[in-house]
A protein has these predicted regions:
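A cytosolic-side transmembrane-helix exit/cap motif
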Residues: 43-44, 181-191
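Active-site-proximal inter-transmembrane loops
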Residues: 124-131, 186-212, 216-219
């Protein structure tokens, strides 16, 4: 009897080797990641897709057992994060709370916000509130993770406690810590969104595609988080697979520009297309500014002197919007403009282009006139790349 008990505690029911246990842990934590990104994030918080009741309830049950998180709480906190991003009211912004606070205590910040009744009431609408949610998941949040612990120990013996511990820390570390923390602190940006969001890595596998956080904040209601040809979103791969089996229905993805022949006179269709693709437009303009800056820098390098050193130091930030520059950078702008009229033109036209969709009180006719005027000024600038950019704007449809 004692030997049987010791054998069970050593090996569990499955009698797996250490590497089989490790593979199991990686597999189940991956399912948890997919549950968070596909079900909680894209489906519930942003309504970017609809899930079949079978898929939806599987994820609800699985997340209850592996994280103890409730759908309504998670969706409400995340929606508030978008609504109050990078402000003091943001539940977990490293810009206001500090990177290490969010990275190391992300789960604590989540639990604290979950107790905020106003957040739940204002941002938690439209999430499941059926009998199971009221009488099982919400009522007994600890029961699910306790059941998971019993299952892990039954399958693997004492080592199952380690598997369970890994499951318990997986989301607090990767989602609450890495994504919420470093996803607003370090990485690359495809788009100049109004917040500090970044893409951590172009291949979104470990965190289910959530690595592409700047893409997500730019197109929050898109079911697909990858945007460039070299980016990969494994969450989107699973969504497509579920769609093929009738388990998911995509409602929205990021807009893709459609180009026709350039119009001599812009119309409302062109305006709407440019407005819908404004992030892509500004990202493309930013690349044009970078190319122009490199050309000017190469020219000054041939001449040599202090002007080159000044310009060289500004090459990493000159393409940004003026609102995103700090005071020392803004003070350098007049000197840069004095050294290059071409860069001055690029900078001014960038500000004017961004201002078109910032004018929320302007009528459609006024916005159209401003866009037409912008294209005319770019074409009259004498700068070939600006002329080509204006021609491309005229092609949006």
């Amino acid at each position: 009897m004692l030997n049987s008990l010791l054998d069970f505690l050593s090996h569990g029911l499955l009698r797996f080797s250490w590497w089989q246990v490790a593979l199991f842990a990686l597999a189940v934590t991956h399912v948890t990641i997919i549950g968070v990104t596909v079900y909680l994030h894209r489906c519930q918080a942003h309504r970017a897709l609809e899930l079949h009741p079978i898929a939806s309830h599987f994820f609800r049950l699985w997340l209850w057992m592996t994280t103890g998180m409730l759908t309504g709480q998670w969706a409400a906190i995340h929606r508030k994060h978008h609504a109050k991003c990078e402000t003091e009211e943001d539940p977990h912004s490293p810009q206001t709370r500090g990177i290490w606070k969010v990275f190391l205590e992300g789960a604590e910040l989540y639990r604290a916000e979950a107790k905020n009744e106003e957040t739940m009431r204002k941002f938690g609408h439209g999430t499941p509130n059926d009998w199971l949610e009221r009488n099982l998941y919400s009522k007994y949040p600890i029961l699910g993770i306790s059941m998971m612990m019993v299952i892990d120990v039954a399958l693997f013996g004492v080592i199952g406690l380690t598997v369970w511990a890994v499951q318990m820390v997986w989301i607090p570390f990767w989602a609450a810590g890495v994504v919420n923390g470093f996803g607003h602190f370090w990485g690359y940006r495809n788009f100049n969104s109004a917040d500090a969001s970044t893409n951590l890595f172009p291949w979104g596998i470990v965190i289910g595609g959530e690595e592409l956080h700047n893409n997500h904040h730019t197109f929050a209601t898109s079911a697909k988080l990858s945007n460039k040809w070299y980016e990969f979103d494994i969450g989107w791969m699973y969504i497509r697979i579920m769609s093929a089996f009738g388990l998911a229905k995509v409602k929205k993805v990021a807009p893709t520009p459609r180009l026709n022949k350039p119009k001599t006179v812009l119309d409302q269709e062109t305006l709407q297309a440019v407005l819908s693709n404004r992030y892509e437009v500004m990202a493309r303009y930013g690349k044009a500014v970078k190319r122009a800056y490199r050309q000017e820098l190469a020219h000054l390098k041939e001449i040599g002197g202090e002007k080159y050193q000044l310009m060289r130091g500004a090459r990493k930030w000159f393409h940004k919007d003026a609102d995103g520059l700090d005071e020392p950078q803004k003070k350098l702008l007049p000197e840069i403009f004095a050294n290059s009229q071409k860069l001055h033109t690029y900078f001014q036209l960038r500000q004017d282009l961004a201002a078109i969709w910032d004018r929320s009180t302007a009528s459609r006719e006024q916005l159209l006139a401003q866009l037409q005027d912008w294209c005319h000024r770019a074409e009259q600038s004498g700068i070939k790349s600006l002329q080509e950019f204006a021609t491309r704007l005229r092609r949006y449809a």
